[in-house]
Amino acid sequence: MSPAANMFRTLTLTALVSAVVSAYESQVPLNPQFPEYLNEEWDDSCSISKSTAYDVHDGPNTFSSSPSEDIHSVKISPHVNATNWEQWEFDGLSHTGLSGLLMAFSRDATYAFFGQGNLRVEFYITLGDGSIIQELDFISESYVIDCPDFTAGIWNSTDRSYSFYVTKDHQFARLKFDSWRVRGGFTMSSSTRPHLADGSPWTPDGGKPDATEVSPGLFYGLSMGGAEVDVDATLSSGKRITFKGRGGSTRLWATEGWLKLCDGWKVIRAWAGPYSIVYWDVLSRIDRGVRYVSGHLFYHDELLVGSRVGQPSDKADYVLFNDQFDGEMSGKYKDKNTGHHLEFASPARDKKWTFDVQHIVTQYEIGAGAGFGMSGFANRVVGGEVGGVQYEGKGQSEQTYWPEHIEEWKIWLVWGLGFLGRGKTYVMKLVGYVL
C-alpha cells in the first residue's frame, strides 16, 4: 500500500474512532414507558421478563436448553450474565431476490465494555435499487411477554422502538420498527411446524434432552421453517418500500460469546418450488475444528429430512454441504465461495434431494480485520429430488469467519457504530475500507 493510502487510512480511522467516542459520550440511559398496544393483550396468565440496558447478572444464572419450552420463551433468567446471551431472529426475501430484510433482537453482554449495555437490534434491509440500510441499535430496555396464546417482545428507547409478536402455534408473526431511518413493519404467515436442532418437531411434551443443541454451547429452535412475508415500510426520505416474499424465524441462545463458540458459521434459508430449506453449519472452537450441522428440508410445508448428521449414513437421515467456487459473486473476505451445494438424504426411503445455491446479491458485509468478517447474500437456488422435477427459487445466506480475538478498537468500529445514530449506515462503507 502506498504512503498516501496509508495516511488516508490512518486519518479515516482517527475520524471514525472520534465519531464513535463522541456519540458514546453524548448518550444517557433512558426510561421510556412501555407502549400501550401490548398492554391491552396481556393479563395475569402472562409472564413478563424485563431487562434494561445495564441488567447483567453477577455469576451463574438459570440457563434452559429444555426441548419442551416454547421456542420464543426467555431461556436465560433473571438476566444474561457476562458470557451467555439469547437472540430472536426474523428474516424475509422478495420473490425476485432483490429486496431483503433481517431483524435480530439480542440480550447479550458480550460488548458491555462499550458502556451501552446488553440490548441490541440488528436490522438489515436491502432494496431493489441496490441501496442498503444497516441499523445496529443499542437500546435502553426490553420486555418479553409470554402468554398462553402468544409471545411478544419490544426493544425500545424514547425515540425509536422495535417489536415482535408470534403466536404460540408459530403460524403468524408481526414485527414493527420505528427507527431514525425507516418506519413500518412486516408480517409472516407460516404453515410449517416448529422444529428443534436435531430435526424433531417441537411439542410441549418435549423431546430428547439435547434436541435444542446445534453445537457445544449453542442452542437453536426453528420457529418458522418457511413463511410468506409481507413488508411495508417508509424511509426517512419518504420513499415507501413494499415487497412480498419468503422467510422465516430462528431462535438462538448460547453459553459463551461467538468468538469462544466457533471459528465461524454458514446459514442458509431458501425455497424452490414446493421445497423450503434451512441449514446451519458451525465450526466449533469448544470441540476444536469439529464441524456441526443442522438441516431441515420441507416439501409442501411437511418435513422430509431433519438431521444433525453431517456425513453419509446407511441408516440415519443426513445432510451434506459443500462450498462452490465457479460462480460470479463472492464475499470480500477470506472465504471466497460463490455458493453452496446441499444434499439431503433419507436411506430408509432410498431418496436424495440436492440443491445448488448461487450468490446473486451482496446484502451486507462487516469486517473484523485481516480478512475476517461476515457476509450476507441473496441467492438463486435450483434443485429437487434426484431424478425428479427440478425447481428454481431464491434464498438468503450468511457466512462468517472470525479470528480468536478481535482488538477492541476494531469492535468499536464494527459494533460501536450503533452509537452513531442516523449516520452509521454511511460510515459502514469507510469501516469496510479500514478493516
Swiss-Prot record:
Q: Which InterPro entries match?
A: DA_C (IPR054499)
Q: Which residues are glycosylated?
A: 81, 156
Listed pathway(s) = Mycotoxin biosynthesis
Q: Which residues form the signal peptide?
A: 1-23
So which domain of life are we looking at?
Answer: Eukaryota
Query: Which UniProt keywords are present, listed alphabetically?
Result: Glycoprotein, Isomerase, Signal
Top-level enzyme category: isomerase
Describe the disruption phenotype.
Answer: Abolishes the production of xenoacremones A and B.
Q: Does the keyword Lyase apply?
A: no
Q: Does the keyword DNA damage apply?
A: no
Which EC number applies?
Answer: 5.5.1.-
User: Which GO MF term does the entry hold, naming one?
Assistant: isomerase activity
Hey, which family's this protein in? Belongs to the Diels-Alderase family.
Question: What does it do?
Answer: Hexane cyclase; part of the gene cluster that mediates the biosynthesis of xenoacremones such as xenoacremone A, a compound that shows inhibitory activity toward the PI3K/AKT signaling pathway and which has the ability to induce apoptosis of A549 lung cancer cells. Within the pathway, cooperation of the hybrid PKS-NRPS xenE and the trans-acting enoyl reductase xenG is responsible for the formation of the reduced tyrosine-nonaketide derivative. The alpha/beta hydrolase xenA then accelerates intramolecular nucleophilic attack to give a pyrrolidone derivative.
Entry protein name: Hexane cyclase xenF
